[in-house]
Regions:
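Hydrophobic ligand-binding cavity/cleft-lining segments
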Residues: 1-45, 99, 145
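Residue-level detector of alpha-helix boundaries and kinks
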Residues: 2, 12, 52, 79, ...
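Short Pro/Gly-enriched beta-strand edge/turn motifs at strand-loop
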Residues: 18-21, 47-50, 72-78
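Generic recognition of short, well-ordered alpha-helical segments
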Residues: 22, 89, 115-119
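Hydrophobic-ligand binding "helix-grip"
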Residues: 28-29, 36, 41-43, 55-102, ...
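A short acidic/glycine-rich loop-to-helix N-cap element
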Residues: 108-131
Length: 145
């Protein structure tokens, strides 16, 4: 399965970036790639279920995911429950480094079309990488505003 890792450095402070990153329902107000996000259920142990609709390379991609928000490590882990891909799991992480605040995203996915995987996986991998960089850059810019 393809695995994507992105690393985006931003000028805003780590706490401000973390606050913006986990505020997923605000994404559509300042990101053109995110059409809608809704937190369906929030549990007291840091888990929540959300539904997403995003534009990926001109196509609409929709899914529901379970997320684990870990305040101590500033990580937001996710695993698709159902949706357009067979597998979509990963993690966003916010860290303070000497060059600024770093937003790292790692994801593994399977588009679920074995016969076309060789042709589609590289395209999907690039589209996912580009979208994640756009999201991280927008989060960093909003946190810095």
């Amino acid at each position: 399965m393809p695995h994507v890792i992105t690393r985006t450095v931003c000028a805003a402070g780590v706490d401000a970036v973390w606050a913006k990153l986990k505020d997923i329902e605000s994404y559509p107000t300042y990101m053109t790639v995110v059409r809608s996000v809704e937190i369906e259920r929030e549990l007291s142990d840091g888990r929540r279920v959300s539904s997403w609709s995003v534009l990926l390379k001109g196509s609409v991609l929709e899914w529901r995911e379970e997320e684990v928000v870990d305040e101590a490590s500033r990580t937001l882990s996710f695993a698709q429950l159902d949706g357009d891909m067979d597998v979509f799991t990963g993690q966003w992480r916010v860290t303070a480094e000497s060059g600024g605040t770093v937003i790292t995203m790692e994801a593994t996915f399977d588009i679920g079309i074995p016969l076309l995987a060789e042709m589609l996986n590289p395209v999907a991998e690039k589209a996912l990488r580009d979208s994640c960089v756009q999201i991280a850059s927008a989060v960093g810019a909003q946190a810095h505003a």
